[in-house]
Curated annotation (Swiss-Prot):
Name this polypeptide is given: DNA-directed RNA polymerase subunit alpha
Gene that produces this protein: rpoA
Function: DNA-dependent RNA polymerase catalyzes the transcription of DNA into RNA using the four ribonucleoside triphosphates as substrates.
Top enzyme category: transferase
GO biological process: DNA-templated transcription
Keyword Transferase assigned: yes
Transferase as UniProt keyword: yes
Pfam families: RNA_pol_A_bac (PF01000), RNA_pol_A_CTD (PF03118), RNA_pol_L (PF01193)
HAMAP family in alphabetical order: RNApol_bact_RpoA (MF_00059)
Catalytic activity: RNA(n) + a ribonucleoside 5'-triphosphate = RNA(n+1) + diphosphate
Length: 339
């Protein structure tokens, strides 16, 4: 790495990736630098990014497994080397990559004798396995073996109290954290009043996304977190004015779209998917996270409902409104999402 002397405080901040490698299918590493920073800024940015990387990035995991005729998780099945508990632990380690939202079903159905690996999981189209060689179980005898699985995308670490299942279904402690570890360090350079800092950031991921992708997503999450303050300052509104603005009159979309239901030539709104609105991916993903999949789902929401969606911004609301106004064959009220 070539280090350049920082001589002025007016230089533009720049990110650089100084090292990137793949140690294994489930271990990616990236090293980045941000410079030049004033004294104290590197620590501020480093702490915020580390927390966002470890706690705010979404991941996909297997969250439940259902076996047939199994009284408890410590049971063993004749012809299988591992106990049910060991199989559950192996399923917990499976690393998945997806952009799904909500819960999806998957399954394993094989006949022994053979080794069962992650490659044997039958997945929905939107999910893929990072390392297909991850072991699950060893069938020693010619038996049929089936497991029903549930897959979910979320963030953080989720645990669920295990009880003796009557139907053979058991929860799996899910680690929705694709970033395994984050370290940052600070290097000071310059003299006197021209002293500056360089932030070094190291990121390890589980292979479901690259360190660069993780850094981008964490940065976007932090930006979205501070956008409300920026908008308030730009518009010159006081705190009281801002508070009043955050409680706008409810938009009862249902009345406005009564005519739409009649004018769509018999096409029900629950058959018009939000994919057809051609929204930007960020806005689209916000709606999908809130289980808004069709136009009927969208039009049943008030403005307050939409603004409660995580990472949903006023610009997203305005964009949705403009899109509906452009494409729907009715007159819509103007400026409901004023910026």
């Amino acid at each position: 790495m070539v280090r350049e002397e920082i001589t002025g405080s007016t230089q533009k901040l720049e990110w650089k990736c100084v090292e990137s490698r793949v140690d294994s299918k489930r271990l990616y590493y990236g090293r980045f630098i941000l410079s030049p920073l004033r004294k104290g800024q590197a620590d501020t940015v480093g702490i915020a990014l580390r927390r966002a990387l470890l706690g705010e990035i979404e991941g996909t995991c297997i969250t439940r497994a259902k076996f047939g005729n199994v009284p408890h998780e410590y049971s063993t099945i004749v012809g299988i080397e591992e106990s049910i508990q060991e199989i559950l632990l192996n399923l917990k380690e499976i690393v998945l990559r997806s952009n799904l939202y909500g819960v999806r079903d998957a399954s394993i159905c094989v006949k022994g004798p053979r080794y069962i690996t992650a490659q044997d999981i039958i997945l929905p189209p939107s999910v893929e396995i990072v390392d297909t060689a991850q072991p699950i179980a060893n069938l020693r005898e010619p038996i049929d073996f089936c497991i029903e699985l549930q897959i979910k995308r979320d963030r953080g670490y989720h645990t669920e109290l295990r009880k003796n299942s009557q139907d053979g279904s058991y929860p799996i402690d899910a680690v929705f954290m694709p970033v395994r570890n984050v370290n940052y360090s600070i290097f000071s350079c310059g003299n006197g009043n021209e002293k500056h800092e360089i932030l070094f950031l190291e990121i390890w991921t589980n292979g479901s996304l690259t360190p660069k992708e993780a850094l981008y997503e964490a940065s976007r999450n932090l930006i979205d977190l501070f956008l409300p303050f920026i908008h308030t300052e730009e518009e010159g509104t006081s705190f009281e004015e801002s508070k009043n603005r955050l409680t706008p009159p409810l938009l009862t979309f249902q009345k406005r779209f009564t005519n739409l239901k009649k004018n769509k030539k018999g096409i029900p709104l629950n058959c018009i998917f939000i994919d057809q609105l051609e929204l930007p991916s960020r806005t689209y993903n916000c709606l999908k996270r809130a289980n808004i999949h069709t136009l009927l789902d969208l039009l049943s929401k008030t403005e307050e409902d939409l603004m409660r969606i995580n990472s949903f911004r006023m610009e997203d609301g305005k964009l949705i409104w403009d899109t509906l106004e452009k494409h729907l064959p009715i007159d819509l009220p103007k400026n409901k999402f004023s910026l």
